[in-house]
């Protein structure tokens, strides 16, 4: 059986890409370095701002950049792709139509894990970009898992969240 090669479609921000690689490495049971999973990362910080695209309706440049980066991973041999950017998941359906490699839905997996950890009917706090909130990605995924999403109730809190998320990362 050949090994599965993981692709990381990253750069949004670069530290998130590095953090995912570290987490994959730390969670892989390995007695020697050869036991680790093969991971290919394309950290492309030139992908346009996802929140701006969602709020302005100019989504095609983001879709094109995500697809180009995913195709790079596909050509490099990735057999599954992960995207360590919540807001980029608003473009997941479009991206899946443009590449053959399966792409993990981080939002869906988060909702499944929340249900497993806290049980159906639980309330889940949600801090996210304006774009992620507007698309209701997490709200819908959590509702499908019979959970309730609650985001910031005051604009000042959401502004503070955005200030934090907009820092260089």
Model-derived segments and their meaning:
Residues 1-169:
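Non-catalytic structural scaffold of enzyme domains
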């Amino acid at each position: 059986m050949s090994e599965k090669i993981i692709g990381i479609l990253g750069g949004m921000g670069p530290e998130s890409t590095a953090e995912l690689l570290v987490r994959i490495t730390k969670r892989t049971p390995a007695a020697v370095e050869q036991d680790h999973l093969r991971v290919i990362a394309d950290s492309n910080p030139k992908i346009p701002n996802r929140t701006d695209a969602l709020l302005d309706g100019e989504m095609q440049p983001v879709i094109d950049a995500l697809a180009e980066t995913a195709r790079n991973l596909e050509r490099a041999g990735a057999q599954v792709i992960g995207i360590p950017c919540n807001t980029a998941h608003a473009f997941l359906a479009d991206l899946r139509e443009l590449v053959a490699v399966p792409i993990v839905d981080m939002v869906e997996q988060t909702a499944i894990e929340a249900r497993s950890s806290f049980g159906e009917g639980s309330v889940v706090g949600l801090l996210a970009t304006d774009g992620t909130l507007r698309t209701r990605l997490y709200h819908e995924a959590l509702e499908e898992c019979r959970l309730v999403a609650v985001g910031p109730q005051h604009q000042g809190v959401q502004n503070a969240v955005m200030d934090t998320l907009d820092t260089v990362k």
